[in-house]
Amino acid sequence: MILQKGDLLGFVDESSQNINSNTQRLWSFAKLKIKKNTIHLKANTIGCFMLNGIDTISFPIRTKSEDFCEFLVEVRQNNPVGRICLLADNFATHKAKRVREKANELNIILIYLPPYSPDLNPIEYLWKSIKRIISISEIDTREELIKTARDGFFSLTASLSAARMWIPRFLYDKLDLLC
């Protein structure tokens, strides 16, 4: 069994926050005036949504294996006690030898989801919600973009809403291990 009593369980993934990804949709019979931000701002994001630990978010310039290793160190610093089990997709960075070695050194177990199954990772729902928040915000600088993404991330992770359906579906008899 992978999950043991006292383990911390989290979900990790990258996303690119962009002020031009508008996720708002609506029907209207009247002619609407569309407000569009023409500034091109982007922030790479790595996030770790913990079910029973401290969440972590980072905004690296790149998302290469070195950057992901640094992020794993941050996750460990935020969660210094116990083994950490992280669910990750099959992004090449997550499977890099350097990343696997660093995870092993930090007592972090990386559990890879099946290919083409982003719906199994609750953090994907967080990214979608954060992009929605960004799309309706007036943002003029990269710092504002990062602040909006960070605030949205911690607000959403505090409620566990992204994992509400995941927990009973996949953890049913293991939930007591996380307490």
Where are these regions (language model features)?
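Extended, low-complexity cationic-aromatic segments
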Residues: M1-V73
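C-terminal anion-handling pockets and recognition modules
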Residues: G6-D7, I123-C179
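Acidic/histidine-rich, metal-coordinating catalytic segments
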Residues: D13, G82-H94, N121
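RNase H-like polynucleotidyl transferase catalytic core
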Residues: L32-I39, L106-P122
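Short, well-ordered alpha-helical microsegments
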Residues: F68, H94-K97
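RNase H-like two-metal-ion nuclease catalytic core shared by retroviral integrases
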Residues: A88-N90, I111-I133
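Catalytic-core regions built around general acid/base machinery
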Residues: R98-N107
